[in-house]
């Protein structure tokens, strides 16, 4: 087990999460008692308590007063906020995880972008206004792309779409920094934003879904070309 965390709390959190992932503490099992676990990890019981509470909030554990702490089946109890952690823990499944992420983005954005153009065209055009060119960095493109999708999600008038994008941010922007290191990816994105802005200006909501789905297909092709070889840590990608 290789743990990169620097602080005692960070170390304890990574230790427990990796132990759950690797079935040292399998779903449905009971965690060791606080004293035993704190000695095993090498942190104080106060630090351990804070970590356990945080992991319970994220869905990894169930803590009930007077009862032992139970390990959850995190796929059933956690939220989108664990995606980055899962990507770090299981590099072999990262391509599949990201394929699923992109499919979800395409499917829900086809709905909320159309709704945003109907309900809030002025705000939508404001969100789509940018000054980027292919000369801008992958980091800048990743941030812009995320902000455009998130901005249009909130412009739809249904904040739940925005909250979903909030939950995806960590993994989304990490993937984006790698994806937008490719010039074709930048060119395709700029063309997509331009097409969306034109549809919004023309109040043409009928063709939004086709536009989004086509972008999903074309960006998916570029992504699959970039997957070999995929960096072991997307955070190490040149920005």
UniProtKB/Swiss-Prot annotation:
<keyword id="KW-0010">Activator</keyword>
<keyword id="KW-0678">Repressor</keyword>
<keyword id="KW-0443">Lipid metabolism</keyword>
<dbReference type="GO" id="GO:0005737">
    <property type="term" value="C:cytoplasm"/>
</dbReference>
<keyword id="KW-0805">Transcription regulation</keyword>
<comment type="function">
    <text>Multifunctional regulator of fatty acid metabolism.</text>
</comment>
<dbReference type="InterPro" id="IPR036388">
    <property type="entry name" value="WH-like_DNA-bd_sf"/>
</dbReference>
<dbReference type="GO" id="GO:0006631">
    <property type="term" value="P:fatty acid metabolic process"/>
</dbReference>
<feature type="DNA-binding region" description="H-T-H motif">
    <location>
        <begin position="34"/>
        <end position="53"/>
    </location>
</feature>
<dbReference type="GO" id="GO:0000062">
    <property type="term" value="F:fatty-acyl-CoA binding"/>
</dbReference>
<keyword id="KW-0276">Fatty acid metabolism</keyword>
<dbReference type="GO" id="GO:0003700">
    <property type="term" value="F:DNA-binding transcription factor activity"/>
</dbReference>
<dbReference type="GO" id="GO:0019217">
    <property type="term" value="P:regulation of fatty acid metabolic process"/>
</dbReference>
<keyword id="KW-0238">DNA-binding</keyword>
<dbReference type="InterPro" id="IPR014178">
    <property type="entry name" value="FA-response_TF_FadR"/>
</dbReference>
<dbReference type="Pfam" id="PF00392">
    <property type="entry name" value="GntR"/>
</dbReference>
<comment type="subunit">
    <text>Homodimer.</text>
</comment>
<protein>
    <recommendedName>
        <fullName>Fatty acid metabolism regulator protein</fullName>
    </recommendedName>
</protein>
<dbReference type="InterPro" id="IPR028374">
    <property type="entry name" value="FadR_C"/>
</dbReference>
<dbReference type="Pfam" id="PF07840">
    <property type="entry name" value="FadR_C"/>
</dbReference>
<keyword id="KW-0804">Transcription</keyword>
<feature type="domain" description="HTH gntR-type">
    <location>
        <begin position="6"/>
        <end position="74"/>
    </location>
</feature>
<dbReference type="InterPro" id="IPR000524">
    <property type="entry name" value="Tscrpt_reg_HTH_GntR"/>
</dbReference>
<dbReference type="GO" id="GO:0003677">
    <property type="term" value="F:DNA binding"/>
</dbReference>
<dbReference type="InterPro" id="IPR008920">
    <property type="entry name" value="TF_FadR/GntR_C"/>
</dbReference>
<dbReference type="InterPro" id="IPR036390">
    <property type="entry name" value="WH_DNA-bd_sf"/>
</dbReference>
<keyword id="KW-0963">Cytoplasm</keyword>
């Amino acid at each position: 087990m290789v743990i990169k965390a620097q602080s005692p709390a960070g170390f304890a959190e990574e230790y427990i999460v990796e132990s759950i992932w690797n079935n040292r503490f399998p779903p449905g099992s009971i965690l060791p008692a606080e004293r035993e676990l704190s000695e095993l990890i090498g942190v104080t019981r106060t630090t351990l308590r804070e970590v356990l509470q945080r992991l319970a909030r994220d869905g990894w554990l169930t803590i009930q007063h007077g009862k032992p702490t139970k390990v959850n089946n995190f796929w059933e109890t956690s939220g989108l906020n664990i995606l980055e952690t899962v990507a770090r823990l299981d590099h072999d499944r990262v391509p599949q995880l990201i394929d699923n992420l992109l499919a979800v983005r395409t499917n829900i954005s086809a709905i909320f972008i159309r709704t945003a153009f109907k309900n809030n065209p002025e705000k939508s055009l404001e969100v789509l206004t940018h000054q980027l060119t292919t000369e801008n960095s992958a980091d800048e493109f990743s941030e812009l792309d995320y902000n455009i999708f998130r901005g249009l999600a909130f412009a739809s008038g249904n904040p739940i779409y925005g909250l979903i994008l909030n939950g995806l941010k960590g993994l989304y922007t990490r993937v984006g920094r790698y994806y937008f290191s490719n010039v074709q990816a930048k060119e395709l994105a700029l063309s997509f934003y331009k097409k969306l802005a034109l549809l919004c200006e023309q109040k043409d909501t009928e063709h939004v879904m086709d536009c989004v789905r086509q972008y999903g297909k074309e960006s998916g092709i570029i992504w699959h070309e970039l997957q070999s070889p995929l960096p072991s840590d997307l955070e190490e990608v040149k920005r």
